[in-house]
Swiss-Prot record:
Gene3D superfamilies in the record: Phosphorylase Kinase, domain 1 (3.30.200.20), Transferase(Phosphotransferase) domain 1 (1.10.510.10)
EC top class named in words: transferase
Xref: PROSITE patterns: PROTEIN_KINASE_DOM (PS50011)
All residue ranges annotated as the Protein kinase domain in the record: 102-416
Catalysed reaction, written as an equation: L-seryl-[protein] + ATP = O-phospho-L-seryl-[protein] + ADP + H(+); L-threonyl-[protein] + ATP = O-phospho-L-threonyl-[protein] + ADP + H(+)
Highest taxon of source: Eukaryota
Binding locations of ATP: K131, Q154, R155, H156, F157, Q158, Q159, H160, P161, L162
Name assigned to this protein: Probable serine/threonine-protein kinase kinase DDB_G0280557
Recorded family membership: Belongs to the protein kinase superfamily. CMGC Ser/Thr protein kinase family. MAP kinase subfamily.
UniProt lineage: Eukaryota, Amoebozoa, Evosea, Eumycetozoa, Dictyostelia
UniProt-listed Enzyme Commission number(s): 2.7.11.1
Active-site residues, Swiss-Prot/TrEMBL: D250
GO cellular component: cytoplasm; nucleus
C-alpha cells in the first residue's frame, strides 16, 4: 500500500517576547503576554509577597505572522468533506483538514492518541483548542471506551462552573493514507499504525485555557492566597462529583486549567468511576494511569474503594503547590510505595490490615524500616508550610484511607476561614449511572464509535 508523501515542518520556537514587569512597591509581578495582537495584549497580575523572581515564563509567544487555524467547517459539503493534508510533527504523522490555516506553532500537543491545535472559532471569535483523535485510539476497545467515558462524564458534570467541557464535536474523513508512529507503548517499541483513506477523523473543540495548574506550580507563580483558593475550589468541584456517586481517580494538575480570574477548572474525566459499579471493574483500565497521584490502596488493589482515593490525590497536588515541584517522581508501583514511606514512614499493622494481596503484603514487609512518623516526615519535607497547611497534609496523606479527612472536614478547616463559601459547595442533582450502557465495559470499539457519533456530534 502506498503511503503518501510526508511534509516535514520546522518546529523551532526560539522567540519569546513576553514581558515580566516587577513592581516592588505593590509586591506584584505583572506578566504581559503578547497574543499576536498589539492592541489586546493580556496583562495578568500575580501577587508575590516574597518578591521572588519568576524563573521561567509560562507562555511562549508565537511569531507575529502566526495564523491561528480555523475550526473544521460546520457544514459538510462534497467540496470539503475529504479535504485533508498530512504533516509530520515530533515523530508523528498527522492528518488535518487542508482548509484549516495551520501554523506550526499552533500545535500544542501530539501523541499516538491524537494531536491538539490552537484555533480561533470564527463564529464566537473565541480562541479554542481543537483535538483530533487518532483513528488508532478508536480501533482499540479499551481506549475507545475511555474516550466515551470522558464525554459522558463531561456532559454529566457540565452544569458545574468549575468543569470545562467540549464546545463541539466534528467528524471528517481522511483523504490520504498515512502512518501514526506510536513511540510510547508499554514495550517501548516503535510501531507504525496505519490509517487509511476514508477513515474517520474526530475533532473536539474546547475553550483555550490561560494556564494549567501544572504550569503555575512548576514556574513557582502561586502565592499563599492562590494555593488556598485553588485547593478550596478543587475540593468543592470534587465534592460535586462525589455527590453524583463518582470517584475521579486521576486528578492531574496538567488537566486543571486556570484563568485570569483565578478560576480553576477540571478538564479530563477519562478514569472517573461510578461508585455503584462492580468492584472487579475498578482496575479494568486503571493500570494505565500515572502512579504519581495514586493513593496506596489503588496499588494494593483492595476489594473496596472510596472517595478517600481523591482526597489522597488532592493532597499530593496540594503538596506540589506548596513545594513548587513534584512531590513524587515514580514510574512503577514499587518505587511509588517506597517514596510514600520516605514521606510518611512505614504503614502500621492496622494500615496493612486492608491489604488482601499476599504478594503486595509481602512486598510492603520488605520496605526498609523507618522510625519516621507522618507528622515528622511531612514537617521535614514542607519546612516552609504553615501550621494549617501541615494539618491538612497530615489529614490527607495517610496510608489507610479510613484515617484520611473527608472532603467536608477539609472544607470546614480553619485554613479556609477567610474564603469559606457555602454557596460554592453545591451538589449534583442526579446520580451518574450507565443505565443506557449496561454492558459498557464489554463494548467493542465500533459500537463505541457509533455511540459517540449518535450522541455527541455537533449537528450540521
Amino acid at each position: 500500500m502506498e503511503i503518501n508523501k510526508i511534509i516535514e515542518i520546522n518546529n523551532n520556537n526560539n522567540n519569546n517576547n513576553n514581558k515580566i514587569i516587577e513592581n516592588n512597591n505593590d509586591n506584584k509581578k505583572i506578566i504581559e503576554i503578547n497574543n499576536n495582537n498589539n492592541d489586546n495584549n493580556k496583562i495578568i497580575e500575580i501577587n508575590d509577597n516574597n518578591n521572588n523572581n519568576i524563573k521561567d515564563k509560562i507562555l511562549k509567544k508565537e511569531n507575529k505572522d502566526s495564523i491561528l487555524m480555523k475550526p473544521p467547517p460546520i457544514f459538510i459539503t462534497p467540496a470539503n468533506k475529504d479535504d485533508t493534508i498530512t504533516v509530520f510533527h515530533q515523530g508523528h504523522i498527522i492528518s488535518i483538514p487542508r482548509k484549516l490555516k495551520i501554523n506550526l506553532k499552533s500545535i500544542t500537543d501530539c501523541g499516538p492518541d491524537g494531536v491538539m491545535f490552537r484555533a480561533k472559532n470564527e463564529d464566537s471569535k473565541e480562541e479554542v483548542i481543537v483535538k483530533k483523535i487518532s483513528v488508532f485510539l478508536m480501533k482499540d476497545d479499551k481506549m475507545a471506551r475511555k474516550l466515551l467515558r470522558n464525554l459522558l462524564f463531561q456532559r454529566h458534570f457540565q452544569q458545574h462552573p468549575l468543569v470545562s467541557t467540549f464546545q463541539s464535536v466534528f467528524k471528517r474523513k481522511s483523504s490520504e493514507n498515512y502512518l501514526i508512529s506510536n513511540k510510547n507503548n508499554r514495550n517501548n517499541v516503535r510501531l507504525p499504525l496505519l490509517q487509511q483513506k476514508g477513515d474517520d477523523d474526530i475533532y473536539f473543540e474546547y475553550l483555550l485555557p490561560e494556564f494549567t495548574l501544572l504550569q503555575m506550580i512548576h514556574n513557582k507563580l502561586l502565592t499563599e492566597y492562590n494555593i488556598m483558593i485553588f485547593l478550596y475550589q478543587l475540593l468543592t468541584v470534587v465534592k460535586f462529583m462525589h455527590s453524583a456517586g463518582v470517584i475521579h481517580r486521576d486528578i492531574d494538575p496538567s488537566a486543571i486549567t486556570i484563568d485570569q480570574n483565578q478560576c480553576l477548572k477540571l478538564t479530563e474525566f477519562y478514569f472517573c468511576f461510578p461508585s455503584n459499579c462492580p468492584v472487579d471493574l475498578f482496575f479494568n483500565d486503571y493500570d494505565t494511569s500515572s502512579f504519581i497521584y495514586r493513593a496506596p490502596e489503588t496499588i494494593w488493589r483492595n476489594t473496596t474503594y472510596t472517595t478517600a482515593i481523591d482526597v489522597w490525590n488532592i493532597g499530593v497536588i496540594f503538596g506540589e503547590m506548596i513545594l513548587g515541584k513534584r512531590l513524587f517522581k515514580t514510574q512503577d508501583f514499587e518505587d511509588h510505595l517506597i517514596s510514600i514511606s520516605k514521606l510518611i514512614g512505614n504503614p502500621t499493622a492496622e494500615d496493612l490490615s486492608i491489604v488482601l494481596s499476599k504478594s503486595i503484603f509481602q512486598y510492603m514487609e520488605k520496605i526498609p524500616k523507618s522510625t519516621l512518623t507522618p507528622s515528622v516526615g511531612i514537617k521535614r519535607r514542607f519546612k516552609g508550610a504553615s501550621k494549617d497547611q501541615i494539618e491538612l497534609l497530615q489529614g490527607m496523606l495517610c496510608w489507610d484511607p479510613r484515617k484520611r479527612m473527608t472532603i467536608d472536614q477539609l472544607l470546614a478547616h480553619k485554613y479556609f476561614s477567610t474564603i469559606h463559601d457555602e454557596s460554592m459547595q453545591i451538589k449534583c442533582n442526579e446520580i451518574f449511572n450507565l443505565k443506557y450502557y449496561p454492558d459498557f465495559y464489554k463494548m467493542k470499539s465500533d459500537l463505541v464509535k457509533k455511540s459517540i457519533e449518535n450522541e455527541f456530534l455537533t449537528p450540521c
